[in-house]
């Protein structure tokens, strides 16, 4: 399809130009009830999978927090590792970008790395109010560096900064591998996360959606919608569509991989044999034009020329 996208007058080229013209005219709106992003930090098991506690939190969110997307940094790193250029980025900067994108940051204090993450995030006054700290009840009143340093910094900023959830945590290496009583914090966690922070829709300008200059919730949601409208897509096809919408001045590959990484991490898109496609199967944004007509132009092209491309949806 890449050739057809680059060639003027083709069906998909006309569809892309039409899409671009409406984005240019600020015809994209973010609804007030859009899902929140929750960055979940903590330990990993010996096999590299998330700790049992983090898996319990993800399962809880999928069952009861339909207004939230939980995501892990590891899956974003994995997507970026497929590109040699992106490998030059240090993980601290990437994690900092992810924390800025998130509405909330949950840190389960269960490993040395999670204590390090707490210190890094608590250092930023902008991030302190996003933090939800899960800690062992036995450490509530302990005069430790954690309590007297990062946690005190969070609470001193304001009464609204951060949330602290405690329960009797199992200790030792087995606590990473096996579930404990983390369910004790589910009710207060639900109370924190189930609230919608925004009630009204927003009109989005073109420059706010450009993935070369933004890595935020709006640009991530827009990339999903592009894939849903125009896809399933290969990476080079996505780059060509984004270039036609936002212009040729920027190099999009590395920035798009970061966006794709977060979308894969929250299981909103998937990638099979180099083909990216939506698992969400609905638009994040509202469009003040016939977005389904543009989508049908792409789908008709695939059915005529690449019917095998549409088979990725068969197993969803």
Curated annotation (Swiss-Prot):
GO biological process, any: defense response to virus
Knockout or disruption consequences: Not required for msDNA production.
InterPro entries the record matches: STM3845-like
4Fe-4S recorded as keyword: no
Highest taxon listed in the record's lineage: Bacteria
Keyword Zinc found: no
Keyword annotations: Antiviral defense
Further information: Part of pro-retronphage phiR73, which is homologous to bacteriophage P4. With the help of P2 bacteriophage, is excised and packaged into an infectious virion. Retronphage phiR73 can lysogenize a new host strain, reintegrating its genome into the selC gene of the host chromosome and enabling the newly formed lysogens to produce msDNA-Ec73.
Function: Possible ribosyltransferase/DNA-binding component of antiviral defense system retron Ec73, composed of a non-coding RNA (ncRNA) followed by this protein then a reverse transcriptase (RT). Expression of this retron confers protection against bacteriophages SECphi4, SECphi6, SECphi27 and P1. At multiplicity of infection (MOI) of 0.02 cultures grow normally when infected with SECphi4 without collapsing, at MOI 2 cultures enter growth stasis.
Protein name listed in UniProt: Retron Ec73 putative ribosyltransferase/DNA-binding protein
């Amino acid at each position: 399809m890449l050739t057809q996208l680059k060639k003027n007058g083709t069906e998909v080229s006309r569809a892309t130009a039409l899409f671009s013209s409406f984005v240019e005219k600020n015809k994209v709106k973010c609804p007030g009830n859009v899902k929140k992003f929750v960055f979940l930090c903590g330990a990993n098991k010996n096999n590299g999978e998330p700790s049992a506690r983090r898996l319990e939190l993800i399962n809880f969110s999928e069952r009861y927090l339909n207004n939230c997307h939980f995501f892990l940094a590891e899956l974003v790193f994995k997507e970026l590792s497929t590109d040699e250029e992106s490998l030059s980025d240090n993980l601290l900067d990437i994690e900092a970008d992810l924390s800025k994108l998130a509405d909330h940051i949950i840190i389960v204090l269960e490993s040395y790395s999670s204590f390090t993450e707490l210190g890094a995030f608590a250092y930023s006054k902008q991030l302190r109010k996003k933090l939800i700290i899960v800690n062992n009840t036995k450490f509530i009143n302990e005069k430790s560096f954690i309590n007297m340093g990062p946690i005190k910094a969070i609470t001193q900023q304001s009464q609204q900064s951060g949330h602290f959830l405690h329960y009797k945590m199992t200790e030792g290496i087995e606590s990473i591998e096996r579930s404990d009583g983390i369910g004790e914090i589910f009710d207060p966690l639900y109370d924190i996360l189930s609230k919608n922070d925004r009630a009204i829709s927003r009109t989005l300008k073109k420059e706010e959606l450009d993935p070369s200059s933004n890595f935020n919730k709006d640009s991530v949601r827009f990339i999903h919608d592009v894939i849903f409208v125009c896809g399933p897509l290969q990476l080079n096809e996505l780059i060509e569509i984004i270039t036609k919408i936002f212009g040729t001045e920027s190099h999009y590959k590395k920035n798009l991989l970061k966006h794709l990484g977060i979308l894969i991490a929250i299981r909103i898109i998937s990638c099979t044999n180099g083909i990216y496609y939506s698992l969400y199967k609905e638009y994040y944004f509202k469009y003040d034009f016939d977005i389904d007509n543009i989508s049908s132009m792409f789908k008709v092209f695939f059915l005529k020329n690449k019917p095998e491309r549409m088979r990725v949806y068969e197993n969803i």
